[in-house]
């Protein structure tokens, strides 16, 4: 299904929303968009100097005036006029910059609703921009990514996608696929004449080139995911090793419950912190031990599941443990079970161990891992730990200026499906299969690529994407 086949609940119906964060501020913005919003605005807006209507004003112009509810003045505002199709939504738009108190902002919004607008749904302004052809779906998602970016790398990647860098790459792929599909379709049209418009060797070379390009984008997802979501970092270890204390210390706040009772953390807790421009997504997991209760058993199962997905595992052990050999065995087994993850052993409660240096050397020798000594309680060694964490993942979060990255799981899965379809087409050609089967796989690859930019889309996907936006975006 193409975007033109989809429809808004009421196409072009005027919508209104607050476009700035809720709270007290110097200024706030209330925006309206849709058919007839300039006339709607003229019913409540009066210029302070001069005359003339907003409906008669040129686009990209600002007008100082007052908003009135009947004869009662609501606020002094600046009205910015945008004319279709040169607006964010490609519709008529007005943005009122008013004073930023919550009461006055609420009054301005209510004024718009009382005069014919309805409250916008989450992401509806951006959704209209997409459906009206102002931006593609990938660019729409990039707007949300830029708003929520927490690091410079995430911001730069979102800006790159918003500019259309990835869209251009995908557009080139799609054009090549369309050409290949067109030649195959011609053969089907002239099947009775046994005409071959392109040799199978040439078609094979084209598909191999296309698949290589698709696979390069797939390979960028590991990097792109880290840039967008942060380095997935799991804090693992035995119960009461100090995992929750370490989480709180790294975050600089109390997020996890700290208790001397083993097994306090039954499920995992996730929080993020940024060190040296790299975002780490920390997961405090349930302690690894023989579970006594069903709920604890489930927590440990989830802990191991999170470790399987981790980019970095911090194994925390208590230097005062009486079962050091068991800990060393656990570390060796975990490291062997997760070869793709970076691994760091963290020796906790440094302040309580009389022979800490000797113990740390023994742990390093017994596990073959790098060991950092800390006291999660008083903060000793935490800066060193952060530095080592950054060093371990610096290559994962190194963004080159010219990079085009895939950051979304949705895009990644669509590309994987496209790559599989192209591989199927290559195998069909190699086995001299029917042209209809080859054409089917090429069309499938074309649809998968189109799903990313919105050339092929369905309502459920759009709802999933735009429901993540705030009301005013």
Curated annotation (Swiss-Prot):
The keyword Metal-binding applies. Mg(2+) binds at residues 244, 265. GTP binds at residues 240-245, 259-265, 284-287. It is found in: Cytoplasm. CDD domains: trmE (cd04164), TrmE_N (cd14858). Residues 230-394 form the TrmE-type G domain. Its cofactor is K(+). Exhibits a very high intrinsic GTPase hydrolysis rate. Involved in the addition of a carboxymethylaminomethyl (cmnm) group at the wobble position (U34) of certain tRNAs, forming tRNA-cmnm(5)s(2)U34. This is tRNA modification GTPase MnmE. The gene is mnmE.
């Amino acid at each position: 299904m193409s975007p033109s086949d989809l429809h808004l609940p009421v196409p072009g119906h005027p919508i209104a929303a607050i476009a700035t964060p809720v709270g007290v501020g110097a200024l706030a913005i209330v925006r309206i968009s849709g058919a007839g919003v300039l006339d709607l605005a003229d019913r409540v807006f009066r210029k302070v100097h001069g005359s003339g209507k907003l409906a008669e004003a040129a686009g990209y112009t600002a007008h100082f005036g007052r908003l009135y509810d009947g004869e009662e003045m609501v606020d002094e505002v600046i009205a910015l006029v945008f004319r279709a199709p040169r607006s964010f939504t490609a519709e008529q738009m007005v943005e009122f910059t008013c004073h930023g108190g919550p009461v006055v902002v609420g009054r301005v919004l209510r004024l718009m609703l009382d005069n014919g607008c309805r409250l916008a749904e989450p992401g509806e302004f951006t959704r209209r921009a997409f459906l009206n052809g102002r931006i593609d779906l990938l660019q729409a998602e990039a707007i949300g990514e830029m708003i929520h970016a927490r690091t410079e790398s995430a911001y730069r990647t979102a800006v790159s996608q918003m500019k259309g860098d990835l869209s251009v790459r995908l557009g080139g792929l799609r054009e090549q696929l369309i050409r290949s599909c067109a030649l195959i379709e011609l053969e089907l049209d002239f099947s009775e004449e046994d005409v071959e418009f392109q040799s199978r060797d040439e078609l094979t070379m084209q598909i191999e080139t296309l698949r290589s390009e698709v696979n390069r984008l797939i390979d960028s997802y590991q990097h792109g995911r880290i840039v967008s979501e942060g380095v997935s970092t799991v804090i693992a270890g035995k119960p009461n090793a100090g995992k929750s204390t370490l989480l709180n210390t790294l975050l600089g706040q109390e997020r996890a419950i700290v208790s001397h009772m083993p097994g306090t953390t039954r499920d995992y807790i996730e929080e993020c912190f940024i060190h040296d421009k790299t975002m780490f997504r920390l997961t405090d997991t349930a302690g690894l031990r023989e579970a006594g209760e069903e709920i604890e058993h489930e927590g440990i199962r989830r802990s191991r599941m999170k470790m399987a997905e981790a980019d970095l595992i911090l194994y925390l052990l208590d230097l005062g443990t009486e079962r050091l050999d068991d800990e060393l065995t656990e570390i060796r087994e975990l490291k062997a079970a997760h070869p793709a993850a970076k691994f760091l052993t963290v020796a906790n409660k440094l302040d309580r161990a009389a022979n800490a240096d000797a113990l740390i050397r023994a742990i390093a020798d017994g596990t073959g891992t790098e060991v950092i000594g800390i006291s999660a309680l008083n903060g000793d060694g935490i800066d060193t730990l952060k530095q080592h964490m950054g060093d371990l993942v610096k290559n994962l979060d190194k963004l080159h200026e010219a990079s085009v990255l895939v950051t979304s799981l949705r895009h990644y899965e669509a590309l994987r499906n496209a790559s599989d379809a192209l591989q199927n087409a290559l195998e069909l050609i190699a086995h001299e299969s029917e042209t209809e089967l080859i054409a089917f796989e090429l069309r499938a690859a074309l649809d998968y690529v189109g799903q990313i930019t919105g050339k092929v889309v369905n309502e459920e996907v759009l709802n999933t994407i735009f429901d993540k936006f705030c009301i005013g975006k």
